[in-house]
């Protein structure tokens, strides 16, 4: 029989008493009253904050958006199919935040910054709030450095600066995403981090963009945040803020970033869906009253930081889709009023073969020539003026039968200038190539060619200039000015190439 040793038992009891830690945990809980359509109504959660994350019994996370007298309206970050009426919900005491780090470069993530490219977890040591305050007035400085898109029409006439917000607006299938992806491709070697946010897009379209970026080696400095059309409205609404938080991480580390929101019309629709299901009063076009604030608080996060904060920048290119060219609809007018200019893509121009289909007449950059190098300013001023005069003349010439020689020459020049603005997709040009192209057109060197020969001649001229006159590129990249020496080299190259080209065509 086992002997009972009283001293051993008393020691064990004493140890247990010493180890006992009386910790009282107060948990703010509630009960599900109703769930459906990505919305849950919760009774309880008395001390929940607006925007706080709440956790359901089966693991789904939601955001408390409506704090009403007798219940809390929560939007779900998942399908919530396992949530049952009467199940418990607890407040987490946290607001939505995501992990951030350099390791995100080259990855495709969702609105919660979780990888969706099948390449494993992403290590991160730091967190940022998805919704953080925009830099104040003192934290900013005016935009002065150019962000080159590689598209002649934009860099010469609608220049974009680092820290600017430039809207890309147009009907569906007019090349809005193409302008944005070309801009990402052109940042290669420019030390700019790019973030592409796809909101409510088809998964196939997002895959196509990612493939293009991978093939051209652009994914190594790009992060893709994707919430496709089948994602819950809550995640489509959050995706742009997640992208902004990732871009801010680099901006506050003295880096330059470019963020593309493709597109904000879909985010507004997702927010409208959430708001209507939460029974918030609808306003114009059934959007809620705070849909302006939805976009303004997002786009105000783009900035050029002051020198005391390291001069980092975040340039935003939001995309908005219009219905049959109606720029005066609710969301387009809102975003136009928030941004520093817009690039308008026209379906008519696109269908007539002018690509990128930029309508230079109603596109504008409110930063203007502050975002151009001196060399570009020297050659681009003439281009904009001549194109404006050409557009006016072209409309008039449709009604006039006999035109004088000067008018005919001006029309011919305008057609060739319009031709030099055409570019193939995924073929951005360097600043030096753009300056050379514009100079050739505005100084009448293309007037002797047929309109159909212009692009072929310019492609050959770029190659010829690069191989035989490399000093031209060196002068412009080092001095940022179109010097007399550079002009002499360019004139020489144009003349030599023109002679060669005419001989080729005759042969």
Swiss-Prot record:
Q: Which reaction does it catalyse?
A: ATP + H2O + 4 H(+)(in) = ADP + phosphate + 5 H(+)(out)
Q: Tell me the compartments it is located in.
A: Plastid, Chloroplast thylakoid membrane
Record carries keyword tRNA-binding: no
Gene name as annotated: atpA
**Lineage of the source organism?**
Eukaryota, Viridiplantae, Streptophyta, Embryophyta, Tracheophyta
In this UniProt entry, which residues are annotated as the site Required for activity? 363
Protein name per Swiss-Prot or TrEMBL: ATP synthase subunit alpha, chloroplastic
Q: Which UniProt keywords apply?
A: ATP synthesis, ATP-binding, CF(1), Chloroplast, Hydrogen ion transport, Ion transport, Membrane, Nucleotide-binding, Plastid, Thylakoid, Translocase, Transport
Record-listed E.C. numbers: 7.1.2.2
- Disulfide connectivity for this sequence is none
Q: Which GO terms describe its biological process?
A: proton motive force-driven ATP synthesis
Membrane topology of the entry:
Peripheral membrane protein
Q: Which organism is it from?
A: Solanum tuberosum (Potato)
The free-text function statement in the UniProt record for this protein reads: Produces ATP from ADP in the presence of a proton gradient across the membrane. The alpha chain is a regulatory subunit.
Can you name a GO cellular component term? proton-transporting ATP synthase complex
Q: Which CDD domains match?
A: ATP-synt_F1_alpha_C, ATP-synt_F1_alpha_N, F1-ATPase_alpha_CD
List of residues binding ATP: 170-177
């Amino acid at each position: 029989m086992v002997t009972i040793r009283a001293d051993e038992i008393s020691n064990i009891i004493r140890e247990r008493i010493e180890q006992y830690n009386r910790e009282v945990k107060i948990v703010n809980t509630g009960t599900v009253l109703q769930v459906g359509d990505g919305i849950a109504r919760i009774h309880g959660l008395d001390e929940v904050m607006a925007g706080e994350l709440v956790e359901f019994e089966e693991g789904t996370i939601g955001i408390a958006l409506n704090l009403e007298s007798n219940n809390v309206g929560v939007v779900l970050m998942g399908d919530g199919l396992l949530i049952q009426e009467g199940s418990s919900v607890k407040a987490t005491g946290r607001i939505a935040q995501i992990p951030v780090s350099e390791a995100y470069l080259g990855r495709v993530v969702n609105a919660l910054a979780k990888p969706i490219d099948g390449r494993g977890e992403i290590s991160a040591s730091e967190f940022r709030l998805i919704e953080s305050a925009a830099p104040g007035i003192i934290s900013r400085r005016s935009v002065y450095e150019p962000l080159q898109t590689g598209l002649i029409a934009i860099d010469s006439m609608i220049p974009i600066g680092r820290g600017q917000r430039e809207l890309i607006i147009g009907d569906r299938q007019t090349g809005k995403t193409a302008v944005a992806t070309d801009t990402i491709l052109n940042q290669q070697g420019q030390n700019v981090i790019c973030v592409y946010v796809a909101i409510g897009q088809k998964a196939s379209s997002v895959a196509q963009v990612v493939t293009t970026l991978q093939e051209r080696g652009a994914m190594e400095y790009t992060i893709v945040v994707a919430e496709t059309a089948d994602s819950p409205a809550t995640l489509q609404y959050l995706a742009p803020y997640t992208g902004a938080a990732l871009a801010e991480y680099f901006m506050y580390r003295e880096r330059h970033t470019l963020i593309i929101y493709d597109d904000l019309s879909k985010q507004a629709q997702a927010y409208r869906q959430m708001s209507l299901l939460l029974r918030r009063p609808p306003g114009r076009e059934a959007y809620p009253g705070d849909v302006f604030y939805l976009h303004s608080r997002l786009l105000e996060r783009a900035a050029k930081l002051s020198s005391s904060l390291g001069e980092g920048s975040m340039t935003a290119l939001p995309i908005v889709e219009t219905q049959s060219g109606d720029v005066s609809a609710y969301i387009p007018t809102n975003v136009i009023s928030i941004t520093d200019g817009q690039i308008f893509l026209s379906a008519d121009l696109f269908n007539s073969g002018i690509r990128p289909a930029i309508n230079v007449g109603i596109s504008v950059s409110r930063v203007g020539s502050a975002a151009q190098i001196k060399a570009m300013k020297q050659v681009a001023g003439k281009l904009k003026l001549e194109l404006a005069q050409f557009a006016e003349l072209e409309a008039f010439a449709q009604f006039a039968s006999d035109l004088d020689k000067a008018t005919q020459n001006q029309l011919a020049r305008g057609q060739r200038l319009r031709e030099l603005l055409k570019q193939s997709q995924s073929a951005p040009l360097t600043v030096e190539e753009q300056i050379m192209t514009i100079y050739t057109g505005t100084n009448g060197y293309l007037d002797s060619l047929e309109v159909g020969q212009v692009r072929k001649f310019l492609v050959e001229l770029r190659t010829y200039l690069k191989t035989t006159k490399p000093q031209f590129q060196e002068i412009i990249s080092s001095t940022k000015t179109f010097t007399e020496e550079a002009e002499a080299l360019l004139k020489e190259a144009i003349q030599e190439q023109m002679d060669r080209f005419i001989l080729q065509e005759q042969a």
